[in-house]
Amino acid sequence: MKYSLDTNIFIDGFRNEEAQAEVLAFLNRALPFTYLSAVVMQELCAGGRSADVVRGLERGVFGPFERRRRVFAPSSAAFVESGRVVSVIAASEGWQLFDERPSFLNDALIAASCREQGITLITRDGDFKRLATFVKGFRYALPWPTPTANIQ
């Protein structure tokens, strides 16, 4: 099984020592099966707020995945599928797409690209439950203690 950590898992690890220990323990067990989404990389850089923080991400987080060639990016088909999914959900729920849920676009893109790669997303973000009903074959799991016990 292949895994990818969602942005919220990394952020939790940056903000909290206990969460950081959980992330590191997971990576120690599952690193040979773990990939990094280019969309997650973009979100982490956008939240970095300084060149020093972004350089730290590049060295400490992105670099190990890049050296192992374990970074994946969405295909053009994933972009189209995620756009269609967001359009359907936005219309059915009556939201102004970019005003009310801008991060949902990236979530849909992550879901579609994980599905393409056969990767299970490890996340705490509840939006992925809804996305899983629209992105057929997409799998996600809650992070701890063992993600494989929570695969949806």
Predicted regions and their residues:
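Acidic, PIN/NYN-like endoribonuclease modules and their adjacent C-terminal/linker elements
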Residues: 111-152
